[in-house]
Amino acid sequence: MPLIGDDAPSFTAVTTQGIIKFPDDYKGKWVILFSHPADFTPVCTTEFMTFASMQEEFRSMNTELIGLSIDSVFSHIAWLKRIEEKIEYKGMKNLEIKFPVIEDLKMDVAKKYGMVQPKASTTQAVRAVFIIDPEAKIRTILYYPQSTGRNMQEIKRIVVALQKNAAEKVATPANWQPGEDVIIPPPSSMEAVKERMGKEEEGKRCLDWFMCLKKDTQK
């Protein structure tokens, strides 16, 4: 089972958008790879509709979505068509799901990513989310039980925070939202501590020598 910081396992898979090769087809992009237990299930349907409503928003963030379950591509297609043509939820309807959904009947990809967890199910993937950076490194792993749908806004928030860390080398505090203050890395020497505490900078505030924040300039 891969962990945060590991290389994301490579794979070639049949999907609703044709064959994909990961990571080759996604070089230079952030990827949200997520699994769901089964097609034609209510919680998964709400998740796919919500992801579909946000797919262009994610794409504008240089982030691509890839879905997966242990179902056939024909089941995926039938389910996605039903979602597009028949289902309305929270004002969302007629949603075209443009991102690929992997057929993983032999559980090849699911097992590589630890998406099959026997105490939950031996025949279905759990609700897993892997956020993968442009260098194909795993940056976040999330697991949800079958009964609980994912919070897509939280997934988006994590992507924004990871991208900010990659670009600016800052951290984000608890409950952070884009536009709020970010955390400057703490100094790593006594000299750096003296320099930081003795120097005032516009937009920066220190609660203590190890805890300084600055305004988020890219909102």
From Swiss-Prot:
Location(s), subcellular: Cytoplasm
What catalytic activity does the UniProt entry give for this protein?
Answer: a hydroperoxide + [thioredoxin]-dithiol = an alcohol + [thioredoxin]-disulfide + H2O
Question: Any S-S bridges, and between which cysteines?
Answer: 206-212
Domain Thioredoxin positions: 2-164
As one GO molecular function, the record gives: thioredoxin peroxidase activity
Annotated substrate binding sites: 127
Q: Which GO terms describe its cellular component?
A: cytosol
Decide whether keyword Transmembrane is in the record.
no
Active site at which residues?
44
Q: Which GO terms describe its biological process?
A: cell redox homeostasis; cellular response to stress; hydrogen peroxide catabolic process; response to oxidative stress
Q: Which family does it belong to?
A: Belongs to the peroxiredoxin family. Prx6 subfamily.
| Function description | Thiol-specific peroxidase that catalyzes the reduction of hydrogen peroxide and organic hydroperoxides to water and alcohols, respectively. Plays a role in cell protection against oxidative stress by detoxifying peroxides.
Quote the subunit structure annotation.
Homodecamer. Pentamer of dimers that assemble into a ring structure.
Relay the record's extra comment: The active site is a conserved redox-active cysteine residue, the peroxidatic cysteine (C(P)), which makes the nucleophilic attack on the peroxide substrate. The peroxide oxidizes the C(P)-SH to cysteine sulfenic acid (C(P)-SOH), which then reacts with another cysteine residue, the resolving cysteine (C(R)), to form a disulfide bridge. The disulfide is subsequently reduced by an appropriate electron donor to complete the catalytic cycle.
**UniProt protein name:** Peroxiredoxin
